[in-house]
Amino acid sequence: GKGPVAAVIMELIQGEAGVMPLGADYVKAARKLCDEHKALLIIDEVQTGIGRTGAWFAFQREDLSGGVTPDIVTFAKGVGGGFPMGGMISFGAELSALFTPGSHGSTFAGNPLGASAALATLGVIEEDNLVDNAEERGKQLRDGIASCGNPLFVSVRGRGLLDAIELAHPCSHAA
């Protein structure tokens, strides 16, 4: 229906759609519209966050976001190292003040075991430099596939270790 829009929620890379980046110009246009209409820009980093794209969050990559900072970032999956955990980050004092201790920001957030798993996971990612490693290994993977000359591979795309290979022929059976 008609009326004010509260928020725009987007993934910077459409993972389930085949690892399709939105593009920095699209994200900048969305930010502009959100600002004009006083709507929040929320970036869903459930699949792209916690280092998978070669940055802690995909929105931190200039090539994906055009330098846009969202109002809210949501994240899960990677932060718990296999244990269900989710969270959100809000930017700006006014918005952050709305989320006080005890506020419900995620189904799996706020439990002691999940928080411990997240702290341990983040510690390993940082100590072992896994964010930079994802960027380097992803580039190595994409360059290797692109240069192998196999006619089965039409294209390869991605950021960090979130990648897709487009095949020349559909594959109808499980890999």
Write out the residue ranges for each language-model feature.
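Conserved N-terminal phosphate-binding loop of PLP-dependent enzymes in the Aspartate aminotransferase
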Residues: 1-175
